[in-house]
């Protein structure tokens, strides 16, 4: 889960549906990015950061704890 990305989206008043439309992708594709299942292409990553007005480098970090092997 990319908790920072989800937090920023919600704090800016977006649902996944409205945010995905704002950045030009499908809701399902955006959901996969937010859960960490997919990496956004560079152009989409830049649009996401621009719409959220966030320019830190940690927005796409996965924050799920790593389990033992």
Which residues are covered by each model-predicted region?
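Short alpha-helical DNA-recognition segment
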Residues: 13-32
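Residues in the recognition helix of alpha-helical DNA-binding motifs
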Residues: 8, 22, 33, 62
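The alpha-helix within a helix-turn-helix
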Residues: 9, 20, 49
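A short, Lys/Arg-rich alpha-helix, primarily the initiator
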Residues: 1-11
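DNA major-groove recognition helix of helix-turn-helix
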Residues: 34, 44, 52
């Amino acid at each position: 889960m990319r908790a920072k990305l989800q937090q920023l989206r919600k704090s800016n008043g977006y649902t996944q549906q409205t945010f995905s439309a704002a950045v030009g992708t499908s809701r399902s594709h955006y959901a996969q990015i937010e859960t960490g299942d997919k990496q956004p292409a560079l152009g989409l990553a830049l649009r996401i950061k621009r719409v959220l007005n966030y320019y830190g480098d940690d927005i796409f970090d996965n924050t799920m704890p790593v389990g033992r092997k």
